[in-house]
Amino acid sequence: VSGCEIEGTVENSILSHDVKIAEGAVVRNSIIYAGAEIEKNAVIDHAIIDENVKVGKGAKIGAEQKGSSLSIAVLGRDITVSDNTVVEAGKIIDENV
């Protein structure tokens, strides 16, 4: 993907331009918009991350899904998720946490 820096793992996901995925970070089954930064050891699973979002080290966004019912975690534009924060599946976050 143009302009992305991927040092972690990305599976079944869509990345826009200028996304940074740090070493040890995992992104699965998610959509990550432009300028987002996923820091070291963060896990993103079944989530939509809007533009210019920073996900801190060790944060957990969304959850692995099983069965036919899916819950997507959504992070709004220009927010910061602090280190080690958990955002559960189905939550919509539109301010810093």
Give the predicted meaning of each segment.
Residues 1-97:
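Left-handed beta-helix
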